[in-house]
Design a protein with these regions (language model features):
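Intrinsically disordered, low-complexity accessory regions that flank the conserved helicase/ATPase core
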Residues: 1-11, 20, 24, 88-93, ...
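Conserved pre-motif I regulatory segment
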Residues: 4-65, 82
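Alpha-helical interaction elements in eukaryotic regulators
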Residues: 14, 18, 30-34, 73-76, ...
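Conserved nucleic-acid-binding Ia/Ib motif block in the N-terminal RecA-like helicase ATPase lobe
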Residues: 27, 89-172, 180-183
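Conserved helicase ATPase motor motifs in RecA-like P-loop NTPase domains
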Residues: 33-36, 64-70, 110-113, 186-192, ...
Length: 218
């Protein structure tokens, strides 16, 4: 469309570091889905130098319906990348004792299948490279649970991508800390809200973002 050809990621408020990473991955222009979602989600969380009243405003939630290949995955990943960049910059100013308390996952991405979860992780790694691997933990059923538990303890990841059963299991065990989740993504929500996922999704929904000022966005 003409709007997509005239808008860039920078125009939408995406920081230069992330624009450069997208370009290096061969992603030059935002898709229609990204043009619709990014203005709603980027900069919705206030920066660290703004006052508490502004920071505690409720976070926006959006629902998106789009076809395969529309760029939907990056439409929700790019705002997460922006949050992580902002938090990394804030952490550089913290002392060691303050950093010790920054252990919670910040973004939870729930998918109905192993295949979709792995595809999302590949997208993160395509854009962020080795750093993406360092900050992301995959939690999917059918894979080695002990290894995933060790990954959570060792990495202290910013992003968790997984299937409902394994995420809920790790949460019940107390290994996965979700009260600091500021973004919950329910990918293919029509499948995830079906009856066979209902119990696990209820737990995920209840626990994610409990400790976030102004609540999480979904």
């Amino acid at each position: 469309s003409s709007s997509s050809s005239s808008s860039s990621f920078a125009d939408l408020g995406v920081p230069k570091q992330i624009v450069d990473a997208l370009r290096a991955a061969g992603i030059e222009k935002p898709s229609v889905a990204q043009l619709a979602a990014l203005p709603e989600l980027i900069d919705s969380r206030t920066s660290e130098d703004e006052n508490d009243a502004a920071r505690s405003q409720s976070m926006p939630s959006i629902a998106m319906q789009s076809h395969t290949g529309s760029g939907k995955t990056l439409a929700y990943l790019i705002p997460i990348f922006c949050d992580i960049l902002r938090e990394e910059e804030a952490m550089e100013k913290m002392d060691r004792n303050q950093k010790r308390h920054v252990n919670d996952v910040r973004a939870m991405i729930v998918a109905p299948s192993q295949e979709l979860a792995m595809q999302i992780v590949r997208t993160i790694e395509t854009v962020l490279g080795p750093y993406g691997r360092d900050i992301t933990q995959q939690l999917i059923g059918g894979a080695n649970a002990r290894r995933q538990e060790q990954g959570l303890r060792k990495k202290r990841p910013f992003i968790v991508v997984g299937t409902p059963g394994r995420i809920a299991e790790m949460s019940r065990m107390g290994v996965l800390k979700t009260h600091g989740v500021s973004t919950l993504v329910i990918d293919e929500a029509d499948d995830l809200l079906a009856s066979n996922f209902r119990r696990d999704m209820a737990r995920i929904n209840e626990h994610c973002g409990k400790g976030v000022k102004g609540g999480r966005r979904t």
